[in-house]
């Protein structure tokens, strides 16, 4: 995964200094993913602004860049990432059973389940507004159209 200097400049312009520091703590693969998600929103900006307004567009863009920042608290290995992707479509009941019985697979799934909460907390500490925090918190369980848009592009990349 690579990030161009021009992309870092765009991210730095989009986020405040504390948010950019938080973005920069993410592994390179997460930074690339976050930029790809944010670019989807950027490329749809006219539609997003007309549907939800400029403030929500800006919140969505920032949330896209920071939505997985909670993962920066954990050292994910490649095999962990593969497991998470492969188990994404397992029924929740089955995943919860693995977590409940403290299996090795369950531990990986638990950490993945917690990253939105950790991300919300880190974003709050970085000065992100409550709407951005909620977008980060709910990016795997969207409850409104704006959250669904973030989830859609997150799942695409």
Role assignments for model-derived ranges:
Residues 1-22, 142, 157:
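Non-catalytic interface/linker regions that flank or bridge core catalytic/transmembrane domains
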Residues 20-157:
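Divalent metal-dependent catalytic cores for phosphoryl transfer on phosphate-bearing substrates
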């Amino acid at each position: 995964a690579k990030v161009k200097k021009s992309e870092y400049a765009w991210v730095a312009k989009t986020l405040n200094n504390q948010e950019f520091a938080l973005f920069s703590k993410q592994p390179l693969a997460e930074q690339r993913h976050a930029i790809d998600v944010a670019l989807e929103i950027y490329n749809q900006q006219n539609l997003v602004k007309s549907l939800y307004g400029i403030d929500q567009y800006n919140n969505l863009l920032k949330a896209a860049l920071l939505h997985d920042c909670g993962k920066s608290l954990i050292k994910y290995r490649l095999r962990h990432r593969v497991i998470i992707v492969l188990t994404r479509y397992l029924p929740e009941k089955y995943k919860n059973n693995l977590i409940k019985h403290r299996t090795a697979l369950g531990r990986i799934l638990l950490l993945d389940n917690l990253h939105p909460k950790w991300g919300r907390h880190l974003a709050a500490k970085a000065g992100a507004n409550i709407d951005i925090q909620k977008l980060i918190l709910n990016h795997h369980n969207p409850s409104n159209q704006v959250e669904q848009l973030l989830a859609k592009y997150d799942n695409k990349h």
